[in-house]
Amino acid sequence: MRAIRTMFRTGPPRWRVAILDRDCSSRALLRAAVEDAGGLVAVEAPLRLDAIVVMKETGPDVVILAPSLGGSHEPALMPRITAELDCPAVLFTRDTDRSVVKQANRAGVMGFMLKPLRAAELGPTLDLALARFRELRRLQQARADRPFVDQAKGRLMSDRQLSEAEAFRWLRRQAMDSRQRLGDVAREVLAAESVLQSVPEGAR
């Protein structure tokens, strides 16, 4: 049934997944579950640091990390792997020790699946990990944009005699009309003002 569903699937995959697990049988189970859920396995490899190179080339949407109980060095690789990749990670393990959970949290892992694999849980777990990751990125971007938005509001308030609320509404409306992020519109406002100030007053 899995082969039939994979063969006749149309459109893009639900996600492109990297599986890092040194256990071949475990990788096979994960691959089957990913494909059954409408996903595509872009990378399969043991959980090693050199897998980062391959994953960067393929650009998965999400990576499943499966450290083995005998691989004492593998949990230590998780922070390095998650730091290098611009995608969420999900931990697949039978180890429920609190120290492992804390280590995974510090590494930025966005989801957990316990062995043995329950295939029905894989889809919702990957979807939730992606949603959490995107929200985190949105908040990080908003934090980075805030100084530029504040400066642009101040410039609009000064140049156009607007209140702070009016200046913010103007920026937001421009962002919606141009389908740009608010921070990008703010940067454009500041860049335009910088260009204007560089022009001699008599030439304006």
Model-derived regions: residue spans:
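Non-catalytic signal-transmission and effector/linker regions of two-component phosphorelay proteins
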Residues: 1-16
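Conserved acidic segment of CheY-like receiver
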Residues: 13-25, 30-34, 63
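Conserved phosphotransfer microenvironments
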Residues: 27, 48-52, 61-81
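Short hydrophobic/Thr-rich beta-strand motif most characteristic of the beta2 strand and flanking loop
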Residues: 38-46, 54
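A short, hydrophobic beta-strand element within the central beta-sheet of small alpha/beta folds
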Residues: 63, 87-96
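C-terminal output helix
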Residues: 99, 117-126
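C-terminal output/effector regions of signal-responsive regulators
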Residues: 141-204
